[in-house]
Curated annotation (Swiss-Prot):
GO molecular function: ATP binding; ATP hydrolysis activity
Keyword DNA repair belongs to the record: no
Places the protein is found: Cell inner membrane
Segments forming domain ABC transporter: 1-216
Membrane topology field: Peripheral membrane protein
Protein name: Aliphatic sulfonates import ATP-binding protein SsuB 2
Organism of origin: Pseudomonas syringae pv. tomato (strain ATCC BAA-871 / DC3000)
Subunit structure: The complex is composed of two ATP-binding proteins (SsuB), two transmembrane proteins (SsuC) and a solute-binding protein (SsuA).
Gene (UniProt): ssuB2
List of residues binding ATP: G33, P34, S35, G36, C37, G38, K39, S40
């Protein structure tokens, strides 16, 4: 997928400017930057949810799916029904059952959202994102609302699912450690207007050890770039 955003404005105010981004098949890329720099807007452009901009998006064949910061589950539907909700022709129960097992929610197919923890609800949201067999999965701060331990487990789950289904991930995050742990590349964004100021290749094999000193060095580099981009 190739994305070019020459300019995106709201009420005459430029929020994104001069962005060129290519996503390779099976690649995991994180967008890292401050609130208000346009990360989520860029994600919406990639998803096709925002079309009022100057530029272009050239998609590869296949579906693009979106996982939001909040699970956004229908409270009156079961886990199974929430995962297959987008299918107007009646959902594929066998596929839904497989996804429920893959995200670690076996035994909860008939549970309502009120019976789920925050981490469990986000597992449902990820399964719902995978239901359409996407080639690209877009995630907007998907783990920001859960505790640190749950976040680490969900990060590992996401990596397993991405490898199993051979999908490309584009992730928005404020968490430097998360970006480096998950990604093949980290793109630092500055603001006013939002643009990509630095690309940081991670270049480490997966699965990664969170204690790897190379990750610490990359974190120092990322923090330097964020500082130079006037993010911190």
């Amino acid at each position: 997928m190739d994305i070019r955003v020459d300019r995106k404005a709201f009420a005459g105010h430029t929020v994104l400017h001069d962005i060129n981004l290519s996503l390779q098949t099976g690649e995991i890329v994180s967008l890292l930057g401050p609130s208000g720099c346009g990360k989520s807007t860029l994600l919406r452009i990639v998803a096709g949810l925002e079309q009022d901009f100057r530029g272009s998006v050239e998609r590869i064949q296949g579906q693009v799916a979106f996982v939001f910061q909040e699970p956004r589950l229908m409270p009156w539907l079961t886990v199974e029904q929430n995962i297959g909700f987008s299918d107007d022709n009646g959902y594929d129960r066998k596929w839904v059952s497989q996804l429920i097992e893959e995200v670690g929610l076996s035994g909860f197919a008939n549970a309502l959202p009120k019976a789920l923890s925050g981490g469990m609800a986000q597992r449902v949201a990820i399964a719902r994102g995978l239901y359409s067999h996407p080639t690209i999965l877009l995630l907007d701060e998907p783990f920001s609302a859960v505790d640190a331990f749950t976040r680490m487990k969900l990060q590992d789950l996401l990596l397993q699912l991405a490898e199993r289904h051979a999908i490309t991930l584009l992730l928005v995050t404020h968490d430097v450690d998360e970006a480096l742990y998950l990604s093949d590349r980290v793109l630092v964004m500055g603001s006013r207007p939002g643009t990509i100021t630095h690309e940081l290749p991670v270049g480490l094999q997966t699965p990664r050890d969170r204690r790897d000193p190379l990750l610490a060095r990359l974190k120092a580099e990322a923090l330097t770039e964020l500082h130079q981009a006037q993010v911190i």
